[in-house]
Amino acid sequence: MKKYIICFCSIKSKGLNCVNEYNKVIQQKINPPAPDKPEMKVKTTVFRQGDRVMQTKNNEFVSNGETGIIVSIEKDEDEELLCGIKFDGKHDTIWYDIEDMSNITLAYSITIHKSQGSEYKTVIMPMMKSFFIMLKRNLLYTAVTRAKSKVIIVGQKQTIFIAVNKTETDKRNTQLGARI
């Protein structure tokens, strides 16, 4: 399965302009509920057959950050729901029970950090003043360079100028010097 369009956000779970909220809205437009479409609810997330998803924690078969499509949701012999996911670049379908699905998230929208190392045909990037702390040149560069064909930036023009001109990066206190 090729990666066509992805929406990048700076923030995962705070406010209306975050990855989690965008995923819900995009899912409703691209893969709405239907009587013949199986679903699996895990905590507050509803997964449907056909959803684009991402692994969030390494396991035996799949690494953190890998994406795929839910190809099947069905019950096993004990009437427990199982979710089959076909990950990009893998031949086999990987099966998850409800507990394992806690390491899966919708992937219509992802953070810029999660996008590193991946490419997409089209990138849609919301840039809002509410992302002020994340408006940095290096993040804009990362987002733009993930696109193979097209970048669509949505938001206030001023936010692009802020990001382009904000070159300082946060100083990280890793204590690396003390550990060496």
What are these regions (language model features)?
Residues 1-180:
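Core RecA-like ATPase module of SF1/SF2 helicases and allied nucleic-acid translocases
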